[in-house]
């Protein structure tokens, strides 16, 4: 059984909120709420790629800097970035200066444009991979799933980079493709209700 922690407001939250004070707001207003906006979906999968090998606290602290540096994750604009932009970004101390991850985000922006042409939207594509709830029987006990493995494989086949199964699973958790809030977390039933009323794209 996954654990919860009781915050200063008396609410039970997922235990990972205890790792940093800024996590409470992120947990309460973003994590796990279903997202069908293409730009937000693209931003999140890029930031999950940047997180690889690092903590989410590091990425969250730099998120506004990332948005400023990466054209607010408008993938149509980011797809036009060139080698000069890569070199500029490598000098930006406000972000994670990792050439491979920077180049992957630009590459993925181009692949996102292609995906919209083929699929209609990023949301229509990603939500096709919404798993059956039974796949995650006990919340927060897995770092990958059969669906995250399948989605990762398909993205790589389409030319996306830094989209391994663990990265993709974290993306699915955060974007509400699954409800992975802990049993006992005050938000778990709310997320269930939001997911029930969500009109799936595509």
Positions of PLM-derived features:
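HhH-family (HhH-GPD) DNA N-glycosylase catalytic core used in base-excision repair
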Residues: 1-202
């Amino acid at each position: 059984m996954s654990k919860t922690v009781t915050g200063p407001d008396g609410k039970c939250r997922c235990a990972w909120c205890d790792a940093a004070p800024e996590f409470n707001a992120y947990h309460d207003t973003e994590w796990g709420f279903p997202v069908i906006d293409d730009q937000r979906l693209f931003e999140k999968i890029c930031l999950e790629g940047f997180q690889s090998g690092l903590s989410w606290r590091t990425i969250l602290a730099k998120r506004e800097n990332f948005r400023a540096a990466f054209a607010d994750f408008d993938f149509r604009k980011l797809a036009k970035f060139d080698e000069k932009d890569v070199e500029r970004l490598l000098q930006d101390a406000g972000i994670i200066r990792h050439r491979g991850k920077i180049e992957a985000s630009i590459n993925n922006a181009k692949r996102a444009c292609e995906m919209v042409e083929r699929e209609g939207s990023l949301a229509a594509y990603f939500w096709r991979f919404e798993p059956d709830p039974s796949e995650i029987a006990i919340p927060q006990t897995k770092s990958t799933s059969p669906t995250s493995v399948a989605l990762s494989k398909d993205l790589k086949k389409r030319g996306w980079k830094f989209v391994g199964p663990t990265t993709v699973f974290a993306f699915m958790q955060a974007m509400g493709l699954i409800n992975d809030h802990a049993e006992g977390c005050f938000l778990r039933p709310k997320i269930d209700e939001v997911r029930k009323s969500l009109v799936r794209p595509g």
